[in-house]
Amino acid sequence: VELWNEYYASWGEEDGGFSQDFLSGALTKGGDICLYVLDKLKLEYDYDAWVGLLPILNRYEFSGFMDDYEVTAWDWLRENIISYLPIEVVNSAGGITPNLNLYFYSQTPETQYTITENGQFEIITGIQPLDQPIVNHLTIKFCYSLAYDSYQSSIIVDPRITEEQALIVNDPVARLSFQRFGLREEVLELPFVWDLKTAFRIARDKIRVRGLGAKAIEVSATPRYSYLGIGDIIALSSDIGLENHKCQIIGKSWDDNRWRFVLHIEENPIINPRGL
């Protein structure tokens, strides 16, 4: 007869768990967790770039239990931490590098470059929808209890409400999305989030990037545009109806001696008053 016993432990907010290498207290902040895992794995990464973003990444806090012995540390980090931070992670000359996603960081992101379409920076596709479901009503489940196998708390972004409550809020992008597309609901479970502010940040980030639908164009550019990177925001003008339209680079590759860029085109009057 095989017997199986389960044991659970609990501890205070500043007790137990992994501790930080350089500061006192538990390892809970998003940027610190990324640096800790990258360092322990002996991966090549851009230390200065990660440290430079700590003031932003450490606004997101994570806690929880890891009981999956088959998942690798890097896969766990990507799926449970990095995917909820306002960054795009790329491989650069310095190794694994974070690029701040300015669409998450600000409702009205500033452009870094202004470009008018020309023979050296040429749009080669029409505006095409990306395969990304629209969401404007988002329920976030967090505070996962391993002992009870359930989430102990939740928050909701609801575009229909007129008066906000402690755990149910509205959002300008969600409201605009609801007016355009009707109600689009989704539930997101966050097993490593216990902090209320972090839950709200992640909820608004998801609404921000998925509330209005995602469209894209592809650009072919000469080598002189090698300075453009994933995550950069440009003001693009072209004959297809774009006039200083803010776009974000979401893809970059090298093909037949030219750069290929994929630009995210957003129809958001807060950012692009002229529209498409």
Task: Give the positions of each predicted feature.
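C-terminal extracytoplasmic interaction modules
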Residues: 7-276
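Extended acidic/polar, glycine-enriched regions
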Residues: 1-3
